[in-house]
Structures are given as structure tokens and as C-alpha cells.
């Protein structure tokens, strides 16, 4: 009996994969430390400014600091985990193809966000909400094999908030309280587009 236990340990060692272990460790560590302050060291300055502005507008809209922190923390964790999976070549060909589609969809979303702000009377909350939900579905498919149900819940938490038509209508209201936030968000997104980071 004791011999069988040792033998099974050897078998387990044969399938040991340090690369997978490293990716798991990175995901676990970053999952624990992916707060807004830590993420600023892992995310460039422009992205950090956009995240900060998303936090401010979310906090003001929800009137709930804790909820705003949770949404932005979930966004940061998702972005970081996605980057780790991508950089460590964890995606298969189908997932890589989907990742390319996802990048294009996010780029389209960014262009639409800015365009709706810059061109008067073009804003359509249903268009933005649809784009956000298309991004959500692609993201779920990309991470399906790799991340936990909890991570999928984080994705939903983020997209449930940002794709909410009432939130989008408030954000884009030309006479509303969020106009300065939208201006800063669009400035940051424009910069990210110029730097080809989105």
C-alpha cells in the first residue's frame, strides 16, 4: 500500500509542468494583489488614468465607494489575468483567433465611445450596450478553459455595470454631472488609441 502511494507520487511528478505552475502562481498572486494601486505598476500611465476615471464616475453614479472599488478591481484582475494567459502562450488556435476578434471589438468600442462624445446627437446607448455585451461574450469564450467560475462572475460584474443603459445615458447626458468624467475618459481613450494600446 505504501509503495503504491510512492508510485503515484512519481506518476504525478512525470506530468508536472513548471510553466503551468508558474502561470497558476502568477494568477493566484495577482488575484490577491490586483488592487487599483498595485495595478498602476502593471498598467501604463494612460490606462491607469482611464481606470481612475472609470472608478470616479462609477463611485459617483452608484453612490457606493465599495461597489465602485469592486467593479474596478474586477476589471483590473480580468485584464491582468488575460494578459498573463496571453503572454504565457496558454491559448489554443481558436482562442487566439477569438482574442484577435476581441481586440478588434474593443478597438471598435473605444472608437465608438469617443465618437459619441465628440459628435453631437450621435450617442445611442443601445449601440454601446450591445458592443459591450459582445465584448463580454467573446471574453467568456476566450477564458472558458482557463479561469474559474469566480472569474466569469467578475467579468459579468464589470460588464453588467458598464453596459447598463441607464448608466450610459447618465454618462453621456450633455447637461448631466458626468460630463467632466466623460471628457477625461475620452481624452484617455484617445491617447490609448494614438499609442495603439487599445
Swiss-Prot record:
Coiled-coil features, chain-numbered ranges: 49-83
Main location (coarse class): cytoplasm
Entry keyword Cytoplasm: yes
Keywords carried by this UniProt record: Apoptosis, Coiled coil, Cytoplasm
TM segment ranges: none
Top-level lineage group: Eukaryota
GO BP terms in the entry: apoptotic process; regulation of apoptotic process
InterPro entries: TNFAIP8-like, TNFAIP8_sf
GO molecular function, one term: cysteine-type endopeptidase inhibitor activity involved in apoptotic process
Location(s) in or outside the cell: Cytoplasm
GO cellular component terms, semicolon-separated: cytoplasm
Similarity comment: family membership: Belongs to the TNFAIP8 family.
Function, in words: Acts as a negative mediator of apoptosis. Suppresses the TNF-mediated apoptosis by inhibiting caspase-8 activity but not the processing of procaspase-8, subsequently resulting in inhibition of BID cleavage and caspase-3 activation.
Protein's name in the database: Tumor necrosis factor alpha-induced protein 8
Protein's organism: Bos taurus (Bovine)
Amino acid at each position: 500500500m505504501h509503495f503504491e502511494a510512492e508510485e503515484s507520487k512519481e506518476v504525478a511528478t512525470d506530468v508536472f509542468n513548471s510553466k503551468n505552475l508558474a502561470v497558476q502562481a502568477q494568477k493566484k498572486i495577482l488575484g490577491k494583489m490586483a488592487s487599483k494601486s498595485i495595478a498602476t505598476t502593471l498598467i501604463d500611465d494612460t490606462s491607469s488614468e482611464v481606470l481612475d476615471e472609470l472608478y470616479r464616475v462609477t463611485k459617483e453614479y452608484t453612490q457606493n465607494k465599495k461597489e465602485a472599488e469592486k467593479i474596478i478591481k474586477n476589471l483590473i484582475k480580468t485584464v491582468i489575468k488575460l494578459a498573463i494567459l496571453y503572454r504565457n502562450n496558454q491559448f489554443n488556435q481558436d482562442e487566439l483567433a477569438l482574442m484577435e476578434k476581441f481586440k478588434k471589438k474593443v478597438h471598435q468600442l473605444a472608437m465608438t465611445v469617443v465618437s459619441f462624445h465628440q459628435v453631437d446627437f450621435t450617442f445611442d446607448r443601445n449601440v454601446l450596450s450591445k458592443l459591450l455585451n459582445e465584448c463580454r461574450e467573446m471574453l467568456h469564450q476566450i477564458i472558458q478553459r482557463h479561469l474559474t467560475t469566480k472569474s466569469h462572475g467578475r467579468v459579468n460584474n464589470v460588464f453588467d455595470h458598464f453596459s447598463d443603459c441607464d448608466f450610459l445615458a447618465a454618462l453621456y447626458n450633455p447637461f448631466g454631472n458626468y460630463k467632466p468624467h466623460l471628457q477625461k475618459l475620452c481624452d484617455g481613450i484617445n491617447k490609448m488609441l494614438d499609442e495603439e494600446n487599445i
